[in-house]
């Protein structure tokens, strides 16, 4: 059988309680709505709705 090796060029994500906000994104492949929200986040956050801020 073939063993798939990790891509060590990308930082690995480890969920740790002592370091709660790592630099690595939790989702590698964003949906269309998530991408739209990311673009909207680049502008002023005061324009975001409460639901968008929680998302």
From Swiss-Prot:
Q: Which residues carry this modification: Phosphoserine?
A: 31, 33
Subcellular locations according to the entry = Mitochondrion inner membrane
Q: Sorted alphabetically, which Gene3D superfamilies does this protein's record hold? A: Cytochrome c oxidase subunit IV (1.10.442.10)
Q: Which residues carry this modification: N6-succinyllysine?
A: 4, 35
Q: How does it sit in the membrane?
A: Single-pass membrane protein
Q: Where is this region: Disordered?
A: 32-55
Major site of localization recorded for this protein: mitochondrion
| Modified sites of kind N6-acetyllysine | 4, 35, 42
One GO BP annotation is: mitochondrial electron transport, cytochrome c to oxygen
Q: Which GO terms describe its cellular component?
A: mitochondrial inner membrane; respiratory chain complex IV
Q: Which InterPro entries match?
A: Cyt_c_oxidase_su4_fam, Cyt_c_oxidase_su4_sf
Q: Which UniProt keywords apply?
A: Acetylation, Membrane, Mitochondrion, Mitochondrion inner membrane, Phosphoprotein, Transmembrane, Transmembrane helix
Pathway involvement? Energy metabolism; oxidative phosphorylation
Q: How does it assemble?
A: Component of the cytochrome c oxidase (complex IV, CIV), a multisubunit enzyme composed of 14 subunits. The complex is composed of a catalytic core of 3 subunits MT-CO1, MT-CO2 and MT-CO3, encoded in the mitochondrial DNA, and 11 supernumerary subunits COX4I, COX5A, COX5B, COX6A, COX6B, COX6C, COX7A, COX7B, COX7C, COX8 and NDUFA4, which are encoded in the nuclear genome.
What's this chain's function?
Answer: Component of the cytochrome c oxidase, the last enzyme in the mitochondrial electron transport chain which drives oxidative phosphorylation. The respiratory chain contains 3 multisubunit complexes succinate dehydrogenase (complex II, CII), ubiquinol-cytochrome c oxidoreductase (cytochrome b-c1 complex, complex III, CIII) and cytochrome c oxidase (complex IV, CIV), that cooperate to transfer electrons derived from NADH and succinate to molecular oxygen, creating an electrochemical gradient over the inner membrane that drives transmembrane transport and the ATP synthase.
Q: Which family does it belong to?
A: Belongs to the cytochrome c oxidase IV family.
What this protein is called in its record is Cytochrome c oxidase subunit 4 isoform 1, mitochondrial
Native organism? Saimiri ustus (Golden-backed squirrel monkey)
């Amino acid at each position: 059988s073939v063993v798939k090796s990790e891509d060590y060029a990308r930082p690995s994500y480890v969920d740790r309680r002592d370091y709660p906000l790592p630099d690595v994104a939790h989702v590698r492949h964003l949906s269309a709505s998530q991408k739209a929200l990311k673009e909207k986040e680049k502008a002023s956050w005061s324009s975001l709705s409460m639901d968008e801020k929680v998302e």
